[in-house]
Regions:
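Transmembrane-helix bundle of Major Facilitator Superfamily
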Residues: 2-190
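Hydrophobic transmembrane-helix bundles of small-molecule transporters
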Residues: 168-221
Length: 221
């Protein structure tokens, strides 16, 4: 007599996986918001910082380091596993939010955006590696489907939310308001991350394939 496998939904949102699933989706949503949702606040930002001519630079300062972070984060995950990346990258992303959110000059804002982008890239690829390690093969398509939604949703609701925050509070809170969510996301994924081990040299073949696939997925967004 054989027992049937539990439904995929139970693996994603059952007691043992609910926290890490929500944490993963939150981490990706935060990246997507910073990549696409802050555009509504940018006119107010450049006007406040008297840098209208530099309008495009905050976007470039996020996207270019994000690509670098994706590559370097993937290499680190390949060599040492995703555990350290999933702790350090959100910290770097959060530091970028703090620096950008307290910016009084365009130079400081650009530094914050560089930190955000680099942390987001490394964080994104590490999330994809974590999915490959934590979830069963039959559950991964469902997880990746949810992750795709986590990329799309901020592009739809991010701009109006960013506009409302900018109008009723300040553009600074478009960055600072995400800091508690970063802490929450790290707290949710930490139990799963803590149990991951560093891959031995002989085990890095499968890990490398997962990391390469994750890097492409993260770069594609």
């Amino acid at each position: 007599m054989t027992t049937s496998a539990p439904p995929v939904r139970d693996e994603l949102f059952g007691p043992s996986r609910r926290a890490v699933t929500v944490g993963i989706l939150l981490l990706i949503s935060l990246i997507a918001f910073e990549a696409m949702g802050v555009g509504t606040a940018m006119p107010a930002i450049v006007a406040d910082l008297a840098s209208v001519a530099s309008y495009s630079w905050p976007f470039v300062a996020f996207i270019a380091p994000m690509v670098v972070g994706t590559v370097l984060g993937g290499r680190w995950c390949d060599a040492r596993g995703p555990r350290a990346v999933l702790l350090l990258a959100p910290a770097l992303f959060g530091l970028g939010l703090l620096v950008g959110g307290t910016a009084g000059t365009m130079a400081q804002l650009l530094v914050g955006r560089v930190l955000q982008g680099f942390g987001a890239g490394a964080q994104g690829v590490a999330v994809y590696v974590l999915i490959a390690l934590v979830y069963s093969e039959r559950a991964r398509p469902a997880v990746f489907g949810l992750v795709s939604s986590a990329w799309v949703l901020p592009s739809l609701i991010g701009p109006p939310v960013s506009g409302l925050v900018t109008e009723h509070l300040s553009w600074h809170w478009v960055f600072l308001g995400l800091l508690p969510l970063v802490l929450l996301a790290v707290g949710l994924v930490f139990p799963a991350v803590r149990g991951l081990s560093v891959p031995a040299p002989g085990e890095r073949g499968p890990a490398r394939r997962s990391t390469v696939a994750a890097a492409f997925a993260a770069a594609a967004g």
